[in-house]
Amino acid sequence: MTITKEKIATMLSSKLGFSNNLCEEIVNTVFFNILEIAKEQKLTLKNFGSFEVKQKNPRPGINFHTKSPIIIESKKNLRFIPSTKLKALINEHDK
């Protein structure tokens, strides 16, 4: 299931009774701040999980069109690690 920030804001608005515009601003601010923190360091949200940026080193590869060797450049990847509690909630129905 894909959910947009606008949908989250609408759900928040109906749950809390705030205006949709205010809720959109809150959601955008929260996501912006999470991304800003996660860019610099590991970010842990208690009972949800952790976001961390991992640097991938350059590595050899092959150009599939020409079959010639290439170097795949280094890059940063954002990684999410779910908390133990979140994993337990997800797998709760299997018991």
Swiss-Prot record:
Origin superkingdom: Bacteria
Annotated coiled-coil segments of the chain: none
UniProt record similarity statement: Belongs to the bacterial histone-like protein family.
Pfam family, one: Bac_DNA_binding
UniProt KW DNA-binding keyword: yes
Keywords: DNA-binding
GO molecular function: DNA binding; structural constituent of chromatin
Annotated organism of origin: Rickettsia felis (strain ATCC VR-1525 / URRWXCal2)
Protein's name according to its UniProt entry: Histone-like DNA-binding protein
Entry's Gene Ontology cellular component terms: cytosol
